[in-house]
Amino acid sequence: MKKIIVVSIALMLSGCATQVDKFSYLKQWNDSWQACDRQGKTSTLTFPASPWFNALAREDKIAVLIYLNELKDYQCTEDEALRLKAVLADADITTLNDLLKGFIYFEAPDKEAIQHLDQSQVEALAKAIDGPFNPLKVAEDLGMLQP
């Protein structure tokens, strides 16, 4: 799936003539999110101790974990994503922008699933996590995979 997106984007960019080398911005972003993806898969993160998190219902813990995972993935490639977005906006390539919207490494995560929770606690957890992580490993370490 990831390769299909990158190939589609490359084809769209190569067909658009502008003074900016859009392909180099795409390549930088692509290289960055691939590195972040590898980092997350190999992460040995120990989830920060948090009495607040421990007291949450299982569904809320899952929502927080998913949000934090998506946030750290996005933050890992945020600089490259912002540069690519700026180039795409200047070139008015709306099809490519639409294709990338919602891709976790291109957009900040939606807070809807955690909006009812204490945002200062979510932010504290986010600050305590250094970078991308493996959410399945963390969920397993926290005992969240058992029904």
How should these model regions be labeled?
Residues 16-62:
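Immediate post-signal-peptide N-terminus of mature secreted/exported proteins
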